[in-house]
């Protein structure tokens, strides 16, 4: 009798350009884990039905991307602490008792990538640009690294204020209006998607301290719009979100398989794939 190969997937809409199957196939090869990982388009109004069917047909776990992370949060029968704080789920796993646990590995992926680049977060002055789901998902893991301060700025100030209140118990968190952000920061994280449309947040270029690091969660061929601007105005280091993508995937893989794959080689392969080399 042939053994059933464990099935995993990523659900989103659109999903055609997802790098997750590429990443997880390499993880599986690296760790000698027999599994299949596919990209699945869920209808905009049919995410829950699609995921239920996937698990009913024997699926073991899945990643969830836009626009379904909040729905996945509602769907999960149990949540990790970091998923509860993120208010969104990017990883689902079916447990032996049939329950579906929801996790959010985005923040862990970001922190892992920053630390791999030797970015010092302990004692740092961190600025997070944006106050949407991407920002909310990474605040707790960033605060766990014990920065001196974490400032959130956003076009709609009230959203930044809401996040500052929500995470106040976990460290020194403040919200600032964009036009009042003039002091220097050690680590500047752009959680907005502005770079995808070639736009920049309305911020002063005085935010980059000596030896500062710019991190844009978006990625593409070459530097993002935000990182180009950061380097022009004094950022000593600039990284895009491709390493975060690999890091959050490694964290998901760990949740599913109990093994942590190595990220460095996979990131190199993914970068080559992205550049069309």
From Swiss-Prot:
E.C. number: 1.1.1.25
Keyword annotations from UniProtKB, A to Z: Amino-acid biosynthesis, Aromatic amino acid biosynthesis, NADP, Oxidoreductase
Binding site for NADP(+): 81, 130-134, 154-159, 217, 241
Binding of shikimate, residues: 18-20, 65, 90, 106, 219
Pathway(s) this gene product operates in, as recorded in its UniProt entry: Metabolic intermediate biosynthesis; chorismate biosynthesis; chorismate from D-erythrose 4-phosphate and phosphoenolpyruvate: step 4/7
Cellular-component GO terms for this entry: cytosol
Pfam families noted in UniProt: SDH_C, Shikimate_DH, Shikimate_dh_N
Active-site residue list: 69
Molecular function terms, GO-annotated: NADP binding; shikimate 3-dehydrogenase (NADP+) activity
Catalytic activity: shikimate + NADP(+) = 3-dehydroshikimate + NADPH + H(+)
GO biological process: amino acid biosynthetic process; aromatic amino acid family biosynthetic process; chorismate biosynthetic process; shikimate metabolic process
Enzyme class: oxidoreductase
Subunit structure: Homodimer.
Family matches, as HAMAP family: Shikimate_DH_AroE (MF_00222)
Function field: Involved in the biosynthesis of the chorismate, which leads to the biosynthesis of aromatic amino acids. Catalyzes the reversible NADPH linked reduction of 3-dehydroshikimate (DHSA) to yield shikimate (SA).
Family per record: Belongs to the shikimate dehydrogenase family.
Name of the protein described by the UniProt record: Shikimate dehydrogenase (NADP(+))
Species this chain originates from: Vibrio vulnificus (strain YJ016)
């Amino acid at each position: 009798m042939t053994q059933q190969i464990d099935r995993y997937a990523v659900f989103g809409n659109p999903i055609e350009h997802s790098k997750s199957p590429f990443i997880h196939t390499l993880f599986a090869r690296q760790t000698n884990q027999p599994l299949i990982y596919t990209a699945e388009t869920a209808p905009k109004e049919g995410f829950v039905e699609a995921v239920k069917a996937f698990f009913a047909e024997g699926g073991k776990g899945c990643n969830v991307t836009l626009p379904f992370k909040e729905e996945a949060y509602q769907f999960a029968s149990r949540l990790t602490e970091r998923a509860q704080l993120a208010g969104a789920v990017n990883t689902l796993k079916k447990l032996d008792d049939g329950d579906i646990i929801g996790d959010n590995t985005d923040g862990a992926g970001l922190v892992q990538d920053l630390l791999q680049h030797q970015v010092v977060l302990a004692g740092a002055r961190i600025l997070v640009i944006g106050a949407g789901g991407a920002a909310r998902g990474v605040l707790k893991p960033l605060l766990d690294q014990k920065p001196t301060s974490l400032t959130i700025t956003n076009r709609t100030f009230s959203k930044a204020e809401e996040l500052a209140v929500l995470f106040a118990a976990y460290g020194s968190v403040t919200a600032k209006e964009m036009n009042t952000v003039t002091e220097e920061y050690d680590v500047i994280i752009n959680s907005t998607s502005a770079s995808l449309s070639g736009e920049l947040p309305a911020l002063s270029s005085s935010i980059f301290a000596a030896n500062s690091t710019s991190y844009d969660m978006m990625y593409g061929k070459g530097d993002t719009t935000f990182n180009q601007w950061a380097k022009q105005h004094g950022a000593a280091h600039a990284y895009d979100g491709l390493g975060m993508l690999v890091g959050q995937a490694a964290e998901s893989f760990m949740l599913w398989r109990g093994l942590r794959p190595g990220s460095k080689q996979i990131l190199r392969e993914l970068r080559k794939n992205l550049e069309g080399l």
